[in-house]
Amino acid sequence: MAKQKIRIRLKAYDHRVIDQSAEKIVETAKRSGAEVSGPIPLPTEKSVYTIIRAVHKYKDSREQFEQRTHKRLIDIVNPTPKTVDALMGLNLPSGVDIEIKL
Protein backbone atom coordinates (compact mmCIF):
# COMPACT_ATOMS: atom_id res chain seq x y z
CA MET A 1 0.00 0.00 0.00
CA ALA A 2 1.41 3.37 -1.00
CA LYS A 3 1.84 6.06 1.61
CA GLN A 4 -0.07 9.28 1.18
CA LYS A 5 1.96 12.46 1.16
CA ILE A 6 1.16 16.17 1.21
CA ARG A 7 3.91 18.36 -0.25
CA ILE A 8 3.79 22.02 0.77
CA ARG A 9 6.00 24.53 -1.02
CA LEU A 10 6.35 28.02 0.47
CA LYS A 11 7.69 31.14 -1.27
CA ALA A 12 8.29 34.60 0.21
CA TYR A 13 10.52 37.64 -0.17
CA ASP A 14 11.27 37.84 3.57
CA HIS A 15 13.08 34.87 5.12
CA ARG A 16 11.80 35.61 8.64
CA VAL A 17 8.16 35.41 7.55
CA ILE A 18 8.66 32.17 5.64
CA ASP A 19 10.46 30.54 8.59
CA GLN A 20 7.64 31.51 10.98
CA SER A 21 5.05 30.10 8.58
CA ALA A 22 7.00 26.87 8.15
CA GLU A 23 7.26 26.43 11.93
CA LYS A 24 3.49 26.96 12.30
CA ILE A 25 2.77 24.31 9.64
CA VAL A 26 5.21 21.78 11.14
CA GLU A 27 3.87 22.33 14.66
CA THR A 28 0.25 21.95 13.51
CA ALA A 29 0.98 18.77 11.57
CA LYS A 30 2.92 17.18 14.44
CA ARG A 31 0.13 18.03 16.91
CA SER A 32 -2.39 16.23 14.74
CA GLY A 33 -0.28 13.06 14.61
CA ALA A 34 1.34 13.13 11.16
CA GLU A 35 5.00 12.55 10.28
CA VAL A 36 6.75 15.68 9.03
CA SER A 37 9.99 16.07 7.10
CA GLY A 38 11.23 19.59 6.72
CA PRO A 39 11.27 22.50 6.39
CA ILE A 40 13.86 21.93 3.68
CA PRO A 41 15.43 25.17 2.41
CA LEU A 42 15.46 25.31 -1.39
CA PRO A 43 17.81 27.56 -3.41
CA THR A 44 17.03 31.27 -3.22
CA GLU A 45 16.17 32.92 -6.54
CA LYS A 46 17.86 36.27 -7.04
CA SER A 47 16.67 38.65 -9.76
CA VAL A 48 18.87 41.67 -10.45
CA TYR A 49 17.54 44.71 -12.33
CA THR A 50 19.90 47.39 -13.66
CA ILE A 51 18.41 50.83 -14.33
CA ILE A 52 20.02 53.99 -15.69
CA ARG A 53 19.72 56.70 -13.02
CA ALA A 54 19.52 59.65 -15.38
CA VAL A 55 16.50 60.25 -17.57
CA HIS A 56 18.20 61.26 -20.82
CA LYS A 57 21.95 60.47 -20.90
CA TYR A 58 24.81 59.51 -18.54
CA LYS A 59 24.77 55.79 -19.24
CA ASP A 60 27.72 55.23 -16.89
CA SER A 61 25.55 56.11 -13.89
CA ARG A 62 23.43 53.06 -13.12
CA GLU A 63 21.64 51.60 -10.16
CA GLN A 64 21.04 47.94 -9.42
CA PHE A 65 18.08 46.48 -7.54
CA GLU A 66 17.67 42.87 -6.51
CA GLN A 67 14.72 40.77 -5.49
CA ARG A 68 15.30 37.56 -3.52
CA THR A 69 12.69 34.81 -3.39
CA HIS A 70 13.18 32.38 -0.50
CA LYS A 71 11.64 28.90 -0.76
CA ARG A 72 10.95 26.08 1.69
CA LEU A 73 9.61 22.55 1.20
CA ILE A 74 7.63 20.56 3.78
CA ASP A 75 6.49 16.94 3.32
CA ILE A 76 3.71 15.55 5.51
CA VAL A 77 3.63 11.75 5.37
CA ASN A 78 0.50 9.75 6.31
CA PRO A 79 -1.78 12.74 7.00
CA THR A 80 -4.97 12.11 8.95
CA PRO A 81 -8.26 13.91 8.27
CA LYS A 82 -7.55 15.84 11.48
CA THR A 83 -4.26 17.04 9.93
CA VAL A 84 -5.97 18.31 6.79
CA ASP A 85 -8.63 20.16 8.83
CA ALA A 86 -5.97 21.74 11.04
CA LEU A 87 -3.96 22.91 8.02
CA MET A 88 -7.06 24.38 6.35
CA GLY A 89 -7.83 26.47 9.44
CA LEU A 90 -4.29 27.80 9.79
CA ASN A 91 -3.80 31.58 9.46
CA LEU A 92 -0.53 32.50 7.74
CA PRO A 93 0.93 35.95 6.92
CA SER A 94 -0.06 37.60 3.65
CA GLY A 95 3.48 37.68 2.22
CA VAL A 96 3.73 33.89 1.86
CA ASP A 97 2.77 32.00 -1.31
CA ILE A 98 1.66 28.41 -0.64
CA GLU A 99 1.50 25.52 -3.13
CA ILE A 100 -0.03 22.26 -1.90
CA LYS A 101 0.24 18.96 -3.79
CA LEU A 102 -1.41 15.73 -2.70
From Swiss-Prot:
Subunit text: Part of the 30S ribosomal subunit.
Protein's name according to its UniProt entry: Small ribosomal subunit protein uS10
PANTHER family: 30S RIBOSOMAL PROTEIN S10 FAMILY MEMBER
Stated role: Involved in the binding of tRNA to the ribosomes.
NCBIfam families tied to this protein: PRK00596.1, rpsJ_bact
Residues spanning the membrane: none
GO annotation, cellular component aspect: ribonucleoprotein complex; ribosome
Matches recorded under InterPro entries: Ribosomal_uS10 (IPR001848), Ribosomal_uS10_CS (IPR018268), Ribosomal_uS10_dom (IPR027486), Ribosomal_uS10_dom_sf (IPR036838)
Family: Belongs to the universal ribosomal protein uS10 family.
Stretch forming the signal peptide: none
Molecular function via GO: structural constituent of ribosome; tRNA binding
PROSITE patterns (UniProt xref): RIBOSOMAL_S10
HAMAP family: Ribosomal_uS10 (MF_00508)
Record-linked SMART domains: Ribosomal_S10
Gene Ontology biological-process entries: translation
Domain of life: Bacteria
Keywords: Ribonucleoprotein, Ribosomal protein
